[in-house]
Regions:
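PLP-dependent aminotransferase class I/II
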Residues: 1-50
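PLP-dependent enzyme catalytic core of the Aspartate aminotransferase-like
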Residues: 9, 86, 102-144
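Surface-exposed helix-capping loop/turn segments at secondary-structure junctions
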Residues: 26-27, 47-59, 136-142
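Short, contiguous acidic/charged loop-to-helix segments that flank catalytic cores in large enzymes
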Residues: 2-6, 33-34, 56, 70-72, ...
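Conserved C-terminal alpha-helix-loop-beta "cap" of PLP-dependent enzymes
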Residues: 67-110, 118, 123
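Glycine/serine-rich loop-strand microenvironments at binding/catalytic pocket rims
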Residues: 16-22, 70-76, 125-129, 133-136, ...
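Non-transmembrane alpha-helical segments in soluble domains
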Residues: 16, 44, 48, 69, ...
C-alpha cells in the first residue's frame, strides 16, 4: 500500500459518479435545503417573535450553511448555554466560532438546527429564548 498526501481521488470519483455533473450536485443540495429550511424557519421565527425588539440579542439570518449566529449581551453567552443545558437543551459551546473557543465579549452562540426534528427544535427554541431572557435580566440588574 502506498499512501500519498493529496486529494482523495477515489472519493472524488465517487462524487462524480453520484452527481454526474454540477447540475446533479445543485439538485442534491436543493434537497438538503428543503430539509433544512423548515428547521431554520422554526428557530428564526422563535427568535424574532420572542426576542425581536428587546435589544438583548441579535442574530443573522443565513442564506445557506448549517448555523445561525446569535449574539447576546456581552458577558452572557456562556451563562445562556449553561442555563439551556440545565433545562435539557445541549448546544454548541459559547464562543465556538472564535479561535480556541475564546470569545472576548462572551456573546456569541452558534445555533445548529440541522439535527433535531422540527418539534424538538420548537421546544429547544422556547427554552433557549427563556434562557436568553433570564440571563439578560440578571446581567442588566447586575450592571445597574
Amino acid at each position: 500500500t502506498i499512501q500519498t498526501i493529496g486529494h482523495d481521488k477515489l472519493n472524488q470519483l465517487r462524487h462524480v459518479r453520484f452527481f454526474k455533473d454540477i447540475h446533479g450536485m445543485v439538485l442534491h443540495m436543493r434537497k438538503h435545503a428543503d430539509i433544512l429550511r423548515p428547521k431554520f424557519e422554526t428557530v428564526l421565527s422563535g427568535l424574532k417573535n420572542e426576542l425581536g425588539g428587546l435589544e438583548i440579542g441579535s442574530w443573522l439570518e443565513p442564506r445557506g450553511g448549517y448555523f445561525i449566529s446569535f449574539d447576546s449581551l456581552p458577558g452572557c453567552a456562556k451563562a445562556i448555554v449553561a442555563k439551556a443545558k440545565e433545562a435539557g437543551v445541549v448546544m454548541t459551546d459559547a464562543g465556538a466560532t472564535f479561535p480556541y473557543g475564546k470569545d472576548p465579549q462572551d456573546s456569541n452562540i452558534r445555533i445548529a438546527p440541522s439535527y433535531p426534528t422540527p418539534e424538538e427544535l420548537k421546544t429547544a427554541t422556547e427554552i433557549f429564548v427563556l434562557s436568553v431572557k433570564l440571563v439578560s435580566i440578571d446581567k442588566i440588574l447586575e450592571d445597574k
